[in-house]
Amino acid sequence: MLDTLLINIGQLLTMDQEDGLLRREAMNTLPVIENGVVGIENGVITFVGTAEEAKGLQAKEVIDSGGKMVSPGLVDPHTHLVFGGSRENEIALKLQGVPYLEILEQGGGILSTVNATKQASKEELVQKAKFHLDRMLSFGVTTVEAKSGYGLDDETEWKQLEATAQLQKEHPIDLVSTFLGAHAVPKEYKGRSKEFLQWMLDLLPEMKEKQLVEFVDIFCETGVFSVEESKEFLLKAKELGFDVKIHADEIDPLGGAEAAAEIGAASADHLVGASDKGIEMLANSNTVATLLPGTTFYLNKESFARGRKMIDEGVAVALATDFNPGSCPTENIQLIMSIAMLKLKMTPEEVWNAVTVNSSYAINRGDVAGKIRVGRKADLVLWDAYNYAYVPYHYGVSHVNTVWKNGNIAYTRGEQSWSTATI
């Protein structure tokens, strides 16, 4: 007898097509089972199919989905989860047209977050991040990448990473830890960025030993770290056994996309200014293009990443919130799906694949997350929607009814029909 059966699923989005990254037409394809059923035992999916195929199955608990939709848990592959403070006091300055550098000189911008993060205790950071994770869970997210990067010194970076490790133990959401010590150049290292990067590299062996970090990231941008500095830094991180990511071409077409493809990065993120050559190189690589349209939207910029061109040319595209206190303070990945549909010209099918299958590969979770398949852990979302297009169409709210993590209900806001019936 199974532990749980979800029955009467109007649309069961398994996302289970070909293994590996989805590109071109595969991104525009959604495997859907009408009148579907999912069986769960010991936190693992043991049955996926139609009601007809499920006849005779029994479970301790049978949940009637009411004809609504069920999908895999969503994957958010780019967040800056652990930080202190907030920056709502900067909104008025931005609206007045005060340049970011001037805000920075006043102690605002990233410096404000760095100072608040330094002053916060690890436990304070953990509790604050739990609040944000709870919200992510309520939007249907069950796997999250979490970056450090608000320390710019060894003590605070360690504190952020240790907070992430504690959250992994204490919160239902699966976390993937990324070291972003190279997020900016501290004032004391102005003009000496290579020395700062060497300092960050010197921290990596101990991080590897303590298994606190899976990915190493760097902010490759004008005025921060050059393409050559970024490549050298990430290649050294790879030599130490880390997988790598890169904040690439967010503002200027520096060649970050090209660098990511060249060194075999797991993902290149932002890519608003990615060149035609960069897009071509990404299309011919296994590097995922993780697009962050919520950031462009919140910064009130006109030019978004060329998501439509990327998909048409064969780039594997993922979507993420880029949740952070400065440029995208939202945990709402459903809103990101809507913005991607409207501003990146992605179809609903492409959007769904970008927050499940491709986003899981962007953080090396393609074999465990992003699909409903027998043998995988039961990370599932029941939606207050009857078809997948409705979720990005009806924007600005959460359509999530219930979230299962490893077969257990981790979040619910609706009423289900609970019984011990046999189909």
Swiss-Prot record:
Its EC number is 3.5.2.7. Gene3D superfamilies: Metal-dependent hydrolases, Urease, subunit C, domain 1. 4-imidazolone-5-propanoate binds at R87, Y150, H183, E250, S327. It holds the Pfam family Amidohydro_1. The keyword Manganese does not apply. One of its GO terms (biological process) is L-histidine catabolic process to glutamate and formamide. The keyword Metal-binding applies. It is an enzyme of class 3 (hydrolase). Pathway: Amino-acid degradation; L-histidine degradation into L-glutamate; N-formimidoyl-L-glutamate from L-histidine: step 3/3. Zn(2+) binds at H78, H80, H247, D322. Its cofactor is Zn(2+); Fe(3+). It catalyses: 4-imidazolone-5-propanoate + H2O = N-formimidoyl-L-glutamate. Binds 1 zinc or iron ion per subunit. GO terms for molecular function: imidazolonepropionase activity; iron ion binding; zinc ion binding. GO terms for cellular component: cytoplasm. Keywords: Cytoplasm, Histidine metabolism, Hydrolase, Iron, Metal-binding, Zinc. Belongs to the metallo-dependent hydrolases superfamily. HutI family. Catalyzes the hydrolytic cleavage of the carbon-nitrogen bond in imidazolone-5-propanoate to yield N-formimidoyl-L-glutamate. It is the third step in the universal histidine degradation pathway. This is Imidazolonepropionase.
